[in-house]
Amino acid sequence: LLLLALVVPSASAQALSYREAVLRAVDRLNEQSSEANLYRLLELDQPPKADEDPGTPKPVSFTVKETVCPRPTRQPPELCDFKENGRVKQCVGTVTLDQIKDPLDITCNEGVRRFPWWWPFLRRPRLRRQAFPPPNVPGPRFPPPNFPGPRFPPPNFPGPRFPPPNFPGPRFPPPNFPGPPFPPPIFPGPWFPPPPPFRPPPFGPPRFPGRR
């Protein structure tokens, strides 16, 4: 019983917390990275349901962001400031809480897409669907629709009214055509018979009263 009591505390002392396991995974990513700067944990999703076995792989989803610390310095990422407009990566996979075992499977992709903690369990191989020939069943036949069209009354819009045109007429000069050269007309006058010769009446010598 004493030996069992000594083994149990030693096993519990080797167990890490969920956040410590993720930080260890971030350190491993920085060691395997070929980029110039270190990455630091930016955000950690909610941990899954607690499991008593620390050696069981647990799904994890977190986000890392580029810092200002160069990778060759091997400075702890938690002491580095985030780089302005630095690259952000979304990481998913599984980790263990056992200090002896290393993180199992972590994949990081650049972007800001978020995944839930149970996302790795959905990455299962898709079953290949069996191909069946298309059915050769004739489709239903429907008669063409015979709906009467809408009836609209004829439009009764008054026609446009335009004022009478008031354009001045063209001005032409009076014609100045020379008349045809006709000779003056010669009409014969009326014919009258010549008057008879004048003959004075046969009067005697004049007589005056009172003289003899």
Swiss-Prot record:
Sequence repeats lie at residues 132-141, 142-151, 152-161, 162-171, 172-181, 182-191, 192-201. The modification Proline amide is found at residue 209. GO terms for molecular function: lipopolysaccharide binding. One of its GO terms (cellular component) is extracellular space. Residues 132-201 are annotated as: 7 X 10 AA tandem repeats. Residues 1-13 form the signal peptide. The keyword Hydrolase does not apply. Gene3D superfamilies: 3.10.450.10. Residues 151-179, 191-212 are annotated as: Disordered. The keyword Transferase does not apply. InterPro entries: Cathelicidin-like, Cathelicidin_CS, Cystatin_sf. This is Prophenin and tritrpticin precursor. It comes from Sus scrofa (Pig).
